[in-house]
UniProtKB/Swiss-Prot annotation:
Key words of the record: Membrane, Transmembrane, Transmembrane helix
Cellular component terms per the entry's GO annotation: chloroplast; chloroplast envelope; chloroplast thylakoid; membrane
Boundaries of every Rhodanese domain copy: 58-182
Membrane topology per record: Single-pass membrane protein
Chief location bin: membrane
Pfam families membership: Rhodanese (PF00581)
Listed PROSITE patterns: RHODANESE_3
InterPro entries: Rhodanese-like_dom, Rhodanese-like_dom_sf, STR10
Name recorded for this polypeptide: Rhodanese-like domain-containing protein 10
One GO-annotated biological process of the protein: response to cold
Cell compartment(s), UniProt: Membrane
Record organism: Arabidopsis thaliana (Mouse-ear cress)
Length: 214
């Protein structure tokens, strides 16, 4: 089976590197994701296709761990899934952080609706509290597959050895792949926000307008 791993070159890069601290803050998730990719390719972590994910959870006893930020999960989520965000909104309003937030808003936030985030320092702790048995089967998922790769790397380092990774994240999920969905949006659209969200809505509505005008 060919495993489609998310490409790291789609991550937004800043046009100007302001200082070492700023550069390091954007590099950390990428390093973790590379480690997660190696775990997938080595077979230490199971790659699960969206079509088989529900069966893996229902029949094989996997716990579905959603690592998306809270605002993405509010839009759409799988009923009964465990939620521990890998990234949380950065509350710091210091000068350097405010500058980074402005850059983020101009290059990423307005278009995608993504907020300026930081690594959740309590991520591993919260997962261990919720799933203390490290022999448990855990299927890790995010919106597009990259953040869940970083989460897989962290959890493997914590001693979890029966990990799964949903290939491509919820973005690749089709209607019916998970029978019980909560929220106001489709799972595959929950990551999209900002201007992109409204353009997507327009594209979805255009075929309907075309049929009515005939």
């Amino acid at each position: 089976m060919t495993v489609l791993l998310p490409q790291l070159n789609h991550i937004h890069k800043l046009p100007v590197v302001l200082n070492r601290r700023l550069r390091q803050s954007y590099r950390l998730p990428v390093i973790s994701a590379v480690s997660g990719k190696e775990l997938i390719l080595s077979g230490k972590v199971r790659a699960v296709e969206p079509k088989e994910a529900n069966a893996v959870v229902a029949s094989e006893g996997y716990i579905l761990l959603d690592v998306r930020p809270a605002w993405e999960r509010e839009k759409a989520r799988v009923k009964g899934s465990l939620h521990v965000p890998l990234f949380v909104e950065d509350p710091d309003n210091g000068p350097i952080t405010l500058l980074k937030k402005w850059i983020h808003l101009g290059y990423i936030g307005l278009w995608t609706g993504q907020r300026f985030t930081m690594i959740n320092d309590e991520f591993a702790l919260r997962v261990v509290e919720a799933v203390p048995d490290k022999e448990s089967k855990v299927l890790v998922v995010c919106g597009e597959g990259l953040r869940s790769l970083a989460a897989v790397s962290k959890l493997h380092g914590e001693g979890y050895k029966s990990l799964g990774w949903l290939t491509g994240g919820f973005n690749r999920v089709s209607e019916g792949d998970f029978p019980e969905i909560e929220g106001t949006e489709e799972l595959r659209f929950a990551t999209i926000g900002g201007v992109s969200f409204y353009l997507l809505k327009l594209l979805v509505l255009l075929p309907s307008f075309g049929q009515k005008s005939r």
